[in-house]
């Protein structure tokens, strides 16, 4: 299957930098991947086919560095505002659409299944594929000013990069229906950071002023065992049937 290209895609780059964790009380280095479309505050970062390929390569390159952990974050105030829909008209056949979906799936799956711990620092707005990127990481911090949503249903889509399967297991089927369906159909209501934290979509919340520093310290605490994250697997919750009926 050939690569799909959006001629008008505003391409998001994925740059890697390493941070020595010794100052934070852990061994090794943290490879931080920053995704950025280079347009500062004038346009939120979005994720088209080339952008996803860039993230995929960055994950591979970061893994090859053999760091103690890998983290993904965004440019100031933005993680990612979802898939780039500007080029959706080029998807004129099923194979092209399948390519876009599978490329996102396979890229995000690397974060879920990585033997190196993966973290997402949700430093700002996370919508759609941006939220799914965060959910695919094994640990998440969120800035107190961030807003989070899965708005796909509002435009007749579903969270196609695994959010629809990850979120119910993470926060329970009833809560997932609220986030995926009810919020989308209620004028695209977004979750505030503290709401996402309460639901279990994030592990820690920090203020923007020292968000990155505290997020790195959180990574170190997880790695050295000072911080234990306990999660419930909602796969067998009794309210699956009622949640499916509501959906």
Task: Label every PLM stretch briefly.
Residues 86-93, 132, 137-143, 168-170:
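A glycine- and small-aliphatic-rich helix-loop capping segment at beta-alpha/alpha-beta transitions
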